[in-house]
Amino acid sequence: MTSNLFQPPSMAASRGAISRRTGNVKVLVSFTSSNGKTLSFSDNSFRLRPMFIGKVTEQSSCSSPNEQQQDEEQEQEQEEITVSHIKEELYEALKGINRGIFGVKSDKKTEIEGLVKLLECRNPTPEPTGELDKIGGCWKLIYSTITVLGSKRTKLGLRDFVSLGDLLQQIDIAQGKTVHVLKFDVRGLNLLDGEFRIVASFKISSKSSVEITYESSTIKPDQLMNIFRKNMDLLLGIFNPEGLFEISYLDEDLQVGRDGKGNVFVLERIEKP
């Protein structure tokens, strides 16, 4: 999953293959890793700029040490540009979809998840549970494949008088705790800061995943509890983080994770509110 998979050890290794169309771009990226396995991503449409694709530098066996150092520096610089452009395209793709909570069109979903996979292949932190300081803090959800549709949306009042605000994840590494906060705005009750709060604990499960255990949940203020009382189980069933959570991409300001049900979560780091 790390970036060196894109750097073939010799000229005999496969080079990335890219096909482009104007407008939406169909990207086919395939490469052969050092262990002989062929990895590929295809059938995903992206709106990518030409400079998005990283150049794979070939190193000749007769290159001088200085030339090899220059090649390595160029590769590192190109990789940073590539990740930067993936993130830029991802943020652009996420505009106007309200985090995907109420569903997105299939072509848009394919575009977003294709960009997420490209990011995961460039993960600068392949063993995030060994660098917990990078995980701690406050994160805001900007995309998820979890959806609230149909009767669920109606029962929770999300069609009429209840609006979803930010979905936050506050991670306390020292305590081994995570607090998930779902903000609400209820029209007519003048509640600008109502929230549904889920407290959970976590423990390291592997080099890239944690096991999350639900502990408690509350709704504030009391007026909101009166609204959601009959549908608390439904609300908790949608947003309960319990289970295995794999951190598949992590840098200073962006996190991608996948839960045990296959749902994708993209979060950006923010200052604690």
From Swiss-Prot:
Transit peptide: 1-61
Region (Disordered): 57-81
Transmembrane stretches, start-end: none
Gene Ontology terms describing biological process: plastoquinone biosynthetic process
Disruption phenotype: Seedling lethality. Severe reduced growth, strong reduction of levels of plastoquinone-9 (PQ-9), and loss of plastochromanol-8 (PC-8) in leaves when grown on MS medium supplemented with sucrose. Severe decrease of photosynthetic performance and higher levels of reactive oxygen species (ROS) under cold stress.
One GO term describing the cellular component: chloroplast
UniProt entry tagged with the keyword DNA damage: no
Record field: compositional bias (Polar residues): 57-66
Family indicated by similarity: Belongs to the PAP/fibrillin family.
UniProt protein name: Fibrillin-5, chloroplastic
Organism, scientific name: Arabidopsis thaliana (Mouse-ear cress)
Primary gene name: FBN5
